[in-house]
Amino acid sequence: MSGGSARSLGKGSAPPGPVPEGLIRVYSMRFCPFAQRTLLVLNAKGIRHQVININLKNKPEWFFQKNPSGLVPVLENSQGQLIYESAITCEYLDEAYPGKKLLPDDPYEKACQKMVFELSSKVPPLLIRFIRRENEADCSGLKEELRKEFSKLEEVLTKKKTTYFGGSSLSMIDYLIWPWFERLEALELNECIDHTPKLKLWMAAMMKDPAVSALHIEPRDLRAFNDLYLQNSPEACDYGL
C-alpha cells in the first residue's frame, strides 16, 4: 500500500495520473468508515493498492468525474474502470482478485450475509445522528435505539453459535460492519453493548485480525477528527499529519 497517510487532495489540486499497472487505486479519506470497509478488504486479500486521500470538506473538482456523488470510496484500476459505493467495491475486489475468498460460494450462505448486512443498516445513520446531535437530551433516545439494533445482531450470533457473523472464520460481512463498532469507544457508546456478550466477544476477535489492527484508528484521533469535521474545518481530513 502507498499513500495511506498522505495529505488529502482538495479543490484546485491536479488530478492524479493513470493507475500504474499491477495496482488498484482507492480514493479514500483517513477517517471515513465507508472507505475503511474497502481498505479492510484490500488488506485482508493482500491486494497491492495505492491510496489517494480526498478532502471531503473541500473536494477537488475532478473528483466528481470519478464519482458523481463526490463520495469515497472509489476504486480505479489501470484500465480506467471506476467502481464506487463501499459494499459494491468490496464485492468487486473479492470477485476480481485471487487469494482468500471473503464471500461464500454457496448461494444461501451469501444471501445470509446480505441479510445480516441489511439487518445492520440502521447502525450507521444512528451513529451519525449521535455525532451530529445538538444537545445531550438526544442521547438517551439514540442510545436506546442503538441497543435495540445491537440486540438484533446479538441474536444472529446466538442462533449461529459461531464467533463471526459468517461462521467460524472471519468473512466479508464482518469487515462490512466492523468500522462502526470500532467507533463506539471514541463516541463513549460502549455501554450500548453491555447487554450483548456475544457481540463483545466478536469485537474482541475482530481486534486480533491483522487487517483490522493495521487500519485501527485511536479513539482520541477519531474524537479530534469528529470535532473538526463538525466545525466544517478543511483541516479535519488531515488531522494528525
UniProtKB/Swiss-Prot annotation:
InterPro entries referenced in this protein's UniProt entry, alphabetically: Glutathione-S-Trfase_C-like, Glutathione-S-Trfase_C_sf, Glutathione_S-Trfase, Glutathione_S-Trfase_N, GST_C, GST_omega, GST_Omega/HSP26, Thioredoxin-like_sf
Tissue/organ expression: Most abundant in the liver and skeletal muscle; also expressed in heart, diaphragm, colon, thymus, kidney, lung, ovaries, spleen, intestine and pancreas.
Keyword Acetylation among UniProt keywords: yes
Modified sites of kind N6-acetyllysine: 57, 143, 148, 152
A biological-process GO annotation: xenobiotic catabolic process
SUPFAM superfamilies assigned to the protein according to its UniProt record, in alphabetical order: GST C-terminal domain-like, Thioredoxin-like
N-acetylserine: residues carrying this PTM: 2
Domain GST N-terminal span(s) in chain numbering: 22-101
Reactions catalysed, as given in the entry: RX + glutathione = an S-substituted glutathione + a halide anion + H(+); L-dehydroascorbate + 2 glutathione = glutathione disulfide + L-ascorbate; methylarsonate + 2 glutathione + H(+) = methylarsonous acid + glutathione disulfide + H2O
Function of the protein: Exhibits glutathione-dependent thiol transferase and dehydroascorbate reductase activities. Has S-(phenacyl)glutathione reductase activity. Also has glutathione S-transferase activity. Participates in the biotransformation of inorganic arsenic and reduces monomethylarsonic acid (MMA) and dimethylarsonic acid.
Name of this protein: Glutathione S-transferase omega-1
Species this chain originates from: Sus scrofa
